[in-house]
Design a protein with these regions (language model features):
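A conserved beta-strand element that flanks and buttresses the S-adenosyl-L-methionine
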Residues: 115
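Short catalytic micro-motifs in class I SAM-dependent methyltransferases
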Residues: 118-119
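Conserved beta-strand signature within the Rossmann-like core of class I S-adenosyl-L-methionine
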Residues: 141-147
């Protein structure tokens, strides 16, 4: 997984170009999850944000513009972090970026919003990640996550493209599985929506 995102950092970054109408039509989930992140951040007063798997900082830019006063982005791909550093430079000391695996990264304190967008697709150890997110989620805060679901149309295509050709495992989720994942990590309430046919958007709240 690390090798794929390191080698194709610019290619993944390009997927978020708003001007590319074809991307909006073929990958609407990319923009739905960004919208949910922005709405969540904008709904809080001066929130702090932890972005796990921040990639090139595309969503980070939007949540900082939406009012985040402190943003920590973590990604295990150094080329992704380099892109994020250039994109978020204008936000000065509101931003800190770390190139490291989240489970080993030196994260201190709690955050009002924890983002996990386009991350759980690739995690064989999802419960460990959810537990650490809970540990860094402030009381009253929430995790905002996106999760793929098996689709008879997109499922086989993704399996061939990522697993067979790209040597990059893909993990799918069910609504019941997501409830268990976040309840097991300690979250008190989980909101799950399925705006498209191939995945879920989640907000999991810490009491």
């Amino acid at each position: 997984v690390r090798n794929r995102f390191t080698a194709k950092a610019q290619q993944f970054d390009d997927l978020y170009e708003d001007e590319r109408l074809l991307v909006r039509l073929l990958r609407p989930g990319l923009f739905r999850r960004r919208q949910l992140a922005v709405e969540t951040v904008a709904g809080q007063a001066e929130p702090s944000v932890l972005d796990v798997g921040c990639g090139s900082g595309r969503i980070g830019e939007f949540v900082l513009e939406a009012g985040a006063v402190r943003y920590l982005g973590i990604d295990f791909s150094e080329p992704m972090i380099e892109l994020a550093r250039a994109r978020l430079e204008r936000f000065d000391d509101r931003v800190r970026l770390i190139s490291q695996d989240f489970l080993a990264a030196p994260v201190a304190g709690e955050f009002d919003v924890v983002l996990a967008l386009g991350l759980f697709d690739y995690l064989p150890n999802a419960p460990e990640f959810a537990a650490r997110m809970f540990a860094h989620c402030a009381p009253g805060g929430c995790v905002v996550g996106s999760f793929p679901a098996w689709s008879p149309v997109k499922g086989p295509i993704r399996k061939v493209r990522y697993e067979w050709l790209g040597n990059c495992p893909i993990f799918n989720y069910t609504r019941e599985g997501l409830e268990r994942l976040f309840t097991g990590a300690g979250f008190s309430r989980t909101e799950i929506s399925a705006p498209g046919r191939s995945g879920f958007l989640v907000r999991a709240y810490r009491q």
